[in-house]
């Protein structure tokens, strides 16, 4: 219900969803919690939180390095502990997880979904799991009332987009371009055709990700028919550039979010 409530409220005010991505435990768990609290205070619509992984193939260099920073002290137990703390801090904001398949399967699929439900998580996106393998997780997601998110890519066939639209719950992660994550000066591709196709198959909101780093990108995304954006690399870059000064980091994050939300 948290995603539904969020999108309904945004629609009433004719606003776009702005969802930041950060890696849990980057640069450490204490700062990570402060970063997430700053994001919430700054007025983000929802959270997309990553589990650090040694081989994050869908990510560009900025987020790869954030995984490496977090991996110095990361553990599944600490990730779950931080998720619980975030949920206790704010009972209303939707919390999405972005994880790589290996982490989920090595933990045990059903156990993982049961655990994140207990932590107050709302959705999961598995970065490197193709749609064809959805049956491996979908039963556990439904059983534990976790919304499973799937990715709509620019080169997907109409049939694949129909599958993505039909099976995604909460929202659909729509790629602004193919390749890996990373901030861009301009949005290279027009995703309006993909978004239009998705909306023909399902009313599930479509969020645009990959390359979102400026306010004008959000305006462009709105023009393409997107219901919101996911922003990761530009935000993670601020963390990377302020590792020696927590206060400066939090202030810059606040300023960045303030400049992006409208």
Curated annotation (Swiss-Prot):
Keyword DNA repair: no
Assembly, per entry: Tetramer of two alpha and two beta chains.
Xref: PANTHER family: TRYPTOPHAN SYNTHASE ALPHA CHAIN, CHLOROPLASTIC, TRYPTOPHAN SYNTHASE, ALPHA CHAIN
Function statement: The alpha subunit is responsible for the aldol cleavage of indoleglycerol phosphate to indole and glyceraldehyde 3-phosphate.
Active site: 48 (proton acceptor), 59 (proton acceptor)
Molecular-function annotations in GO: tryptophan synthase activity
UniProt superkingdom: Bacteria
InterPro entries from the UniProt entry: Aldolase_TIM (IPR013785), RibuloseP-bd_barrel (IPR011060), Trp_synthase_alpha_AS (IPR018204), Trp_synthase_suA (IPR002028)
Gene3D superfamilies: Aldolase class I
Pfam families documented for this protein: Trp_syntA
Cystine connections: none
Family the UniProt entry places it in: Belongs to the TrpA family.
Protein transport is among the record's keywords: no
E.C. number(s) listed in UniProt: 4.2.1.20
Keywords assigned: Amino-acid biosynthesis, Aromatic amino acid biosynthesis, Lyase, Tryptophan biosynthesis
Associated pathway: Amino-acid biosynthesis; L-tryptophan biosynthesis; L-tryptophan from chorismate: step 5/5
CDD domains membership: Tryptophan_synthase_alpha
Native species: Helicobacter pylori (strain G27)
Gene Ontology cellular component list: cytosol
Catalytic activity: (1S,2R)-1-C-(indol-3-yl)glycerol 3-phosphate + L-serine = D-glyceraldehyde 3-phosphate + L-tryptophan + H2O
Entry protein name: Tryptophan synthase alpha chain
């Amino acid at each position: 219900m948290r995603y539904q409530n969020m999108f309904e409220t945004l629609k009433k005010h004719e606003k776009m969803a702005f969802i930041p991505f950060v890696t849990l435990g980057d640069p450490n768990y204490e700062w990570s919690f402060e970063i997430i609290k700053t994001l919430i205070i700054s007025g983000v619509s929802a959270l997309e939180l990553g589990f650090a992984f040694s081989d994050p193939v869908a990510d560009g260099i900025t987020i790869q390095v954030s995984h490496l920073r977090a991996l110095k002290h990361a553990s599944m137990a600490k990730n779950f502990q931080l998720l619980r703390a975030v949920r206790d801090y704010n009972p209303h904001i939707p919390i999405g997880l972005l994880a790589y398949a290996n982490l989920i399967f090595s933990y045990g699929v059903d156990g993982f979904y049961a655990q994140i439900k207990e932590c107050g998580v709302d959705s999961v996106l598995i970065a490197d799991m193709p749609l064809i393998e959805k049956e491996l997780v979908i039963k556990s997601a439904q059983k534990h009332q976790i919304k499973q998110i799937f990715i709509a890519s620019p080169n997907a066939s109409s049939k694949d987009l129909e599958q993505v639209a039909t099976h995604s719950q909460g929202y659909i992660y729509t790629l602004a371009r193919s390749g890996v994550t990373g901030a861009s000066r301009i949005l290279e591709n027009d995703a309006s055709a993909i978004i239009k196709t998705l909306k023909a198959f399902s009313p599930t909101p479509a969020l645009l990700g990959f390359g979102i780093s400026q306010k004008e990108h959000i305006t462009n995304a709105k023009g393409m028919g997107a219901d919101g954006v996911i922003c990761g690399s530009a935000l993670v870059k601020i963390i990377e550039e302020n590792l020696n000064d927590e206060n400066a980091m939090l202030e810059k994050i606040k300023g960045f979010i303030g400049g992006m939300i409208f």
